[in-house]
C-alpha cells in the first residue's frame, strides 16, 4: 500500500468523524435476519497484509501472485486487493464466497461496503460476479456472470473511505436458485503506476427485504 496512506490516516485520526457507516444506508425495519454475512472477523492486526484464508472461501490469483489480503485499520477488518509494488505486469485476483443457498429466502438483496485508493483507470477494476456451477476448485472453468453495483468515487479526497454498493436484486428465482457463489475479481498491475491502486470490501450481506 502506498506510503502516503500513512499521512492521510494520520490526518484522519485528528479529524472529527461525522459520517455514518455505509452499512447503515440499507438498514430499516423491513429487513429480516441475514441469509449470508461476512465481515472478516478472522482478520488479525498482526497478520494485516497476509493473504486471506477464511474457511469456505476461495482466494485465487489468476494472473501474477497477488491475492486478496487481510486488511486492518483502527479496529476495522476487511479484505484488500492492491497491485502496488507487486512488480508484476498483470495481477488478477478472485475472492469467492462459499455456496449460498438461495432457496431459503424470498426477495433477496445483496449489499456490501467498498473502498478504493489511488485508482485512476477503468482497467484497474473491481467486479462482482456470481456462478451457479462453480465446483469449489476450478475458478476459470465455471461460468461467471457480472452483477452491477455502485462503485466508490475515484476521488483523492475519498481514498480508503467505504461506500455502500447499493442494494443488488437477487430475487429472481428463474436465475438465483439453489446454490450460488459470489466472486469479487480485481485487476491491476505492479509495473504500471496508473494500474496499481487498492480496493477494499467489507460487510458482505444477503438479506430478505419484506
Residue ranges of model-derived segments:
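Extracellular beta-rich ligand/substrate-recognition surface
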Residues: 80-93, 155-162
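Short beta-strands within extracellular/lumenal beta-sheet-rich domains
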Residues: 88-105, 109, 163-168, 200-201
Amino acid at each position: 500500500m502506498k506510503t502516503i496512506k500513512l499521512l492521510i490516516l494520520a490526518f484522519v485520526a485528528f479529524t472529527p468523524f461525522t459520517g455514518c457507516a455505509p452499512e447503515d444506508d440499507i438498514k430499516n425495519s423491513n429487513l429480516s435476519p441475514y441469509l449470508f454475512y461476512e465481515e472478516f472477523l478472522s482478520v488479525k492486526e498482526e497478520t494485516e497484509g497476509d493473504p486471506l484464508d477464511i474457511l469456505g472461501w476461495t482466494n485465487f490469483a489468476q494472473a501474477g501472485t497477488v491475492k486478496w489480503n487481510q486488511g486492518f485499520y483502527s479496529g476495522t477488518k476487511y479484505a484488500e486487493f492492491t497491485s502496488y509494488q507487486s512488480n508484476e505486469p498483470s495481477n488478477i485476483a478472485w475472492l469467492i464466497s462459499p455456496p449460498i443457498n438461495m432457496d431459503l429466502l424470498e426477495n433477496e438483496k445483496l449489499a456490501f461496503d467498498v473502498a478504493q485508493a489511488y485508482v485512476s483507470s477503468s482497467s484497474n477494476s473491481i467486479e462482482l460476479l456470481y456462478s451457479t456451477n462453480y465446483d469449489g476448485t476450478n475458478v476459470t472453468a465455471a461460468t461467471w456472470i457480472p452483477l452491477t453495483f455502485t462503485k466508490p468515487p475515484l476521488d483523492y479526497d475519498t481514498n480508503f473511505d467505504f461506500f455502500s454498493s447499493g442494494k443488488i436484486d437477487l430475487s429472481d428465482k428463474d436465475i438465483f436458485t439453489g446454490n450460488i457463489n459470489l466472486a469479487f475479481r480485481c485487476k491491476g498491475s505492479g509495473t504500471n503506476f496508473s494500474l496499481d491502486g487498492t480496493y477494499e470490501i467489507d460487510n458482505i450481506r444477503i438479506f430478505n427485504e419484506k
